[in-house]
Amino acid sequence: MPVDFTPEQWASYHQEWGDFQREMRLARSGNDTARGRAALMRFRQKAGMLRAAQTAGLVAAHVGRGYQVLVAVELVTTAADPVAEHLERLEIPVARIYGGGADLEAERLRFQRGDAHVVVFNTASAINLQANELMADGSRATSAQRIGIFHQPRYSGIQARQTIGRAHRDYQVCPWSLLYAAGTVEETAAKIMVDRLVVTSNSVDGDTGALHKIAALFGADWLPDSTLEP
């Protein structure tokens, strides 16, 4: 799902993209893997932060229509925190399942019991967020329809599939959207991710092929595949 940048956001994006390309060229010419990794991470951090307000606005609209919303992120300080803070400024309760400072199970239960209408999380496995979950105490999670949003593309198709499965289980259906800034390199990366989800079924070989394509898109095809994974 494309979102549109404001003129100010476009100015920031073009500056960051130019800085990234220059840094990646220098890293590649010196075969400096650490420098290349750092450049790619900085760009992904800044691209995610630029869109935090648009993601929060879309989430707020879904909450207004009665949904409970899952927001999947990869990075904390430049994605999870900004999105959660935007929502809390809109007086929308948010459960935070990321980082090490909170009781993550207590946060999960806040969302499942409806005390928080939104959960922002960065784990791809081992948590249940589906409607009507049967709890350990015999109670059930709320029946409110879940809807999911990828704030950032998961470059690993396998991890993306696992993330989708957090609420798309036990006969519960949770539709997902992938947000990206229209007209940017993120748009192409997002399309590669979606294509990989469509044509593979947890295929390790297929997932590696997608990582190669995305690496080439960023001029990072000389770096190890793990560079694109969180």
Predicted regions and their residues:
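Conserved RecA-like P-loop NTPase helicase motor core
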Residues: 93-190, 196
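Short, catalytically relevant binding-site loops at active-site mouths
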Residues: 77-79, 102-103
